[in-house]
Amino acid sequence: MNYKVYATGNKIEKFYSDAIKEYQKRLNRFCNISFTNYKNPQQLPKQQIDKYYKIGILPSGKSLSSEELAEKIKELELSAKTDILIVIGNEEIPLNESISISPMEMSLGLASTILFEQLYRAYKILNNEPYHK
């Protein structure tokens, strides 16, 4: 799987960036994943976006457990949707679906960190590896 994670909004605090980098490093054994923070939605490279299956992270999106997220990843792989764009903090891009980390509003850095942690957890589940529950 190839993931691009785009976060749009204010700059992300260093401690969140450090946590995201750590999860990126851990995820590299399961998938290819990149993270880019854009100050505003107009900076998004729209010409590249069309080839991706687009998932938005929104408070109003569908709630998933860690196991359900793992199953969603498996379904995407089986349906040959291997280029995934995950967008945090932007509702202007047409999405294929949206999921929720929480119905509460949270900072862009926290939402991004939680997303990376949950992706890591999902891959540990898919590979039958232990992970704290």
UniProtKB/Swiss-Prot annotation:
Record: residues binding S-adenosyl-L-methionine: 55, 89, 101-106
Its EC number(s): 2.1.1.177
Enzyme class, broadest EC rank: transferase
Entry's Gene Ontology molecular function annotations: rRNA (pseudouridine-N3-)-methyltransferase activity
GO cellular component assignments: cytoplasm
Compartments it resides in: Cytoplasm
Quaternary structure (record): Homodimer.
Protein role: Specifically methylates the pseudouridine at position 1915 (m3Psi1915) in 23S rRNA.
Family the entry assigns: Belongs to the RNA methyltransferase RlmH family.
Protein name (record): Ribosomal RNA large subunit methyltransferase H 2
